[in-house]
Amino acid sequence: MIFLYIKLADINYKEDILLALESSEIYKASLVEGINLDNALTRDLALFRGFFDKEHEEEKLVIIINALVDKKERIKEFVFILKESGLDIENEEIIRILTWEVESLKDYL
């Protein structure tokens, strides 16, 4: 089993990611919307809040998607679909994708 981690820093690609997951038959996934902490702490301090406009608020938002995938082929298909869509998957300012092998508790029962 493979754990798939996706950090989407450009939320404009959310639908592309979800469609690619579905097309590659990766269904058991969780999506969490959050805040990128790179600059959030500085911008949220009352002293600095006036220096930043609302236009940059959206760049703090990130989407985290986690999934357990049964076959590497599904992840390869997911990556292929993203490349075909024109998404620059190597640009970590847009998206970061990580995978690692995991074991389930049922493997020990």
Question: How would you name each of these model-derived features?
Answer:
Residues 1-109:
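Positively charged, small/polar-rich N-terminal and surface patches that mediate targeting and assembly
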